[in-house]
Amino acid sequence: MITRMSELFLRTLRDDPADAEVPSHKLLIRAGYVRAVGPGIYSWLPLGLRVLRKIENVVRSEMNAIGAQEILLPALLPRGPYETTNRWTEYGDTLFRLQDRRNNDYLLGPTHEELFTLTVKGEYSSYKDFPVILYQIQTKYRDEARPRAGILRGREFVMKDSYSFDVDDDGLKNAYYQHREAYQRIFARLGVRYVIVSAVSGAMGGSASEEFLAESEVGEDTFVRCVESGYAANVEAVITRAPEAQPTEGLPEAKVYDTPDTPTIATLVEWANSASLPQFEGRTVTAADTLKNVLLKTREPGGEWELLAVGVPGDREVDEKRLGAALEPAEFALLDDADFAANPFLVKGYVGPKALQDNGVRYLVDPRVVHGSSWITGADAPNRHVVGLVAGRDFTPDGTIEAAEVRDGDPSPDGAGVLTSARGIEIGHIFQLGRKYTDAFSADVLGEDGKPLRLTMGSYGIGVSRLVAVIAEQQHDQLGLRWPSSVAPFDVHVVVANKDAGARAGAAELVADLDRLGHEVLFDDRQASPGVKFKDAELLGMPWIVVVGRGWADGVVELRNRFTGETREIAADGAAAEISSVLAG
């Protein structure tokens, strides 16, 4: 196939768009691959659409290889099924909701577990029909509060979502690992650098869950890994390695002290080190010796706000992502002045476990707050703290919560070493959902014994349109985009940098020969300066660039590798065959 740039619907830009934050966003706009229509909404122009379709085809081929069958469900969905699973409420403001002229409620699909479950239930009724894997490649909709980074986080995006249905847990596990391996093949073919991490299931539900994160400094997801063992997890899924519980016998009694002007951890530590506390004789008091109580209110879907206190060591901040994952599907918010006024037993800056538990406030603590651990914390009165308050003796929390930040150097949950953090972009997520959705819709079939058998289910997603940006993010250089051959809009970009009629005719013949050899060719036949053409070729990012320029008079053309920058001269006679051989690898 030959595409002439003189006819291509394309306009490149010399300057970065003012609202672009990350390299992929800047370059995809500048190179004319996409154009913004509104916040988080983009049009796909010819070059961008070619990349998107090639990624879809890689995904499709690997899904077909594991026996998955492609279908297409509507994006406009009725409220009923999502009400049944409570996700009409759980999704909150993320869901695009609308009504038809008869005031019936609908949504634009963010994901399709409900509809796939109902589809399979409606078609199959016997254990003999299973296992089944169905998938679609379809546009999804989520009302992101802060769309950012171009197509990395938009309100409309293309996703591959597949769903496995089995009659037993062994079948589910097999489907899960089939997808896991297929995803690894997909990302290898796309040239994406990624890591597989343990993850939380969130609103999707289910048990086992893993994310595929593309390594990137602009990623929104923080993950940690242990070099020694290979352990890796999304920060929300990290389980704290708690110390051993300690006996409480023989520990000093807790004592309340006047601590003027100490509403923060820093001022409290400063006071403690000046107070010559007997428990800390011979060592310096640090923030890790203090217990910080963070006050929140939470609300289950459709419920009322309730108070919650979270206790964490004072040297740690509460990580809102971990907190949100631990509380999901409930939402949470920090207390405001009105909340404190309505609950006068909460003394801002001096809250301790006693007032919380005396007043029935649910109190969850970090796993490091083990039985027998001793703390400096608030005494529930202005300018007063208690020293030596012992967990399990002086207070008993209602449970533990994984809400404290995870830091570099923390012990790995597997005990093999320490954790280091990095950032990534979620490109895939796989779930063993189990029977959450099949229970909701009573998706039963007749088992071998003639009795009803509840199906079990897996859900597996890949961000197809996001992968366009991820590849651009990982592969670009200072000159522009650089597409791997598996997804490049064209195999080769032929640039005529010579106004000589013979050179132009020779370039056209070379392009025709490459086309006959089965290559997709972008032919820059425009009446523009060589400098403009070269800059566009580097910006657009085809993996190979052929220059028909000054060397034509000497019977040679130039072949450039866009990734390495290496160039070689090739004899004009028979150039197409030699170039084709190089392109074939």
Curated annotation (Swiss-Prot):
Gene Ontology MF: a single term: ATP binding
Q: Name the major location.
A: cytoplasm
Q: What HAMAP family does the annotation carry?
A: Pro_tRNA_synth_type1 (MF_01569)
Any one of the GO BP annotations: prolyl-tRNA aminoacylation
The record comments on the domains as follows:
Consists of three domains: the N-terminal catalytic domain, the editing domain and the C-terminal anticodon-binding domain.
* InterPro entries (UniProt xref): aa-tRNA-synt_IIb, aa-tRNA-synth_II, aa-tRNA-synth_II/BPL/LPL, Anticodon-bd, Anticodon-bd_dom_sf, Pro-tRNA-ligase_IIa, Pro-tRNA-synth_IIa_bac-type, Pro-tRNA-Synthase_IIa_type1
Task: Give UniProt keywords alphabetically.
Answer: Aminoacyl-tRNA synthetase, ATP-binding, Cytoplasm, Isopeptide bond, Ligase, Nucleotide-binding, Protein biosynthesis, Ubl conjugation
EC assignment: the record states 6.1.1.15
Which family is this protein grouped under? Belongs to the class-II aminoacyl-tRNA synthetase family. ProS type 1 subfamily.
Where in the cell? Answer: Cytoplasm
Name of the molecule in the record: Proline--tRNA ligase
Any Gene Ontology CC annotation: cytosol
Report which reactions are catalysed by this protein: tRNA(Pro) + L-proline + ATP = L-prolyl-tRNA(Pro) + AMP + diphosphate
Question: How does the record describe its quaternary structure?
Answer: Homodimer.
Q: What class of enzyme is it?
A: ligase
Crosslink site: Isoglutamyl lysine isopeptide (Lys-Gln) (interchain with Q-Cter in protein Pup): 173
Kindly give the SUPFAM superfamilies that the UniProt entry links to this protein. Answer: Class II aaRS ABD-related, Class II aaRS and biotin synthetases, YbaK/ProRS associated domain
Q: Does the keyword Lipoprotein apply?
A: no
Q: Does the keyword Ubl conjugation apply?
A: yes
**Its biological purpose:** Catalyzes the attachment of proline to tRNA(Pro) in a two-step reaction: proline is first activated by ATP to form Pro-AMP and then transferred to the acceptor end of tRNA(Pro). As ProRS can inadvertently accommodate and process non-cognate amino acids such as alanine and cysteine, to avoid such errors it has two additional distinct editing activities against alanine. One activity is designated as 'pretransfer' editing and involves the tRNA(Pro)-independent hydrolysis of activated Ala-AMP.
